């Protein structure tokens, strides 16, 4: 099931521009599900729409698709169909304990939705990594006149004792790089 703030994360109202690079716009807004602002990042790309969404769907290749995102392991626990799986990513950010993100993903054409799952067996976390209490979001690719527009939305709380301002700064720094990395990977396919 989708979290109560899912629709609010997906709509375009109430977002505040917090970071602008030459290629990526990053917006934030507060949602009731997390004390940390949700984020939306957008990039316009010459890469074909299908290649971008295909790259986002390759969770098991996250360490290659996102080489700058501190992902040290990723994979699929269970693939229900070509458009649905339960997966994981382990993030090991410097100075923090590793986090194990476990989530259900569904692909709807040119969009991917994911929502944290907490119904997995404890043996799927053998190293006892921290499990973030909030994690849901989406990838959406739309086709413009000459460019594809990739939009990434995420509401997350990594848990643990990390000051929120540090998380906000890190997100604003690494989200633009993440979108440029997925574009680079998709462009080589």
Where are these regions (language model features)?
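Eukaryotic helix-grip
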Residues: 1-189
């Amino acid at each position: 099931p989708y979290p109560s703030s899912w629709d609010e994360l997906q709509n375009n109202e109430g977002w505040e521009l917090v970071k602008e690079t030459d290629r990526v716009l990053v917006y934030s807004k507060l949602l009731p599900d997390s004390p940390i602002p949700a984020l939306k990042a957008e990039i316009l790309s010459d890469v074909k729409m299908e290649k971008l969404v295909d790259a986002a769907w390759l969770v098991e290749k996250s360490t290659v698709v996102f080489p700058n995102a501190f992902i040290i392991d990723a994979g699929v626990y269970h693939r229900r169909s070509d458009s649905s799986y339960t997966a994981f990513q382990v993030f090991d950010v410097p100075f923090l304990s590793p986090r194990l993100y476990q989530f259900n993903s569904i692909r709807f054409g040119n969009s991917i939705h994911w929502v944290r799952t907490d119904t997995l067996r404890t043996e799927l976390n053998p190293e006892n990594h921290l499990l973030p209490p909030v994690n849901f979001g989406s990838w959406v690719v739309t086709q413009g006149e000459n460019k594809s527009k990739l939009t990434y939305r995420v509401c997350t709380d990594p848990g643990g004792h990390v000051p929120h301002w540090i998380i906000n700064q890190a997100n604003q720094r690494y989200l633009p790089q993440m979108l440029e990395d997925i574009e680079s990977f998709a462009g080589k396919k």
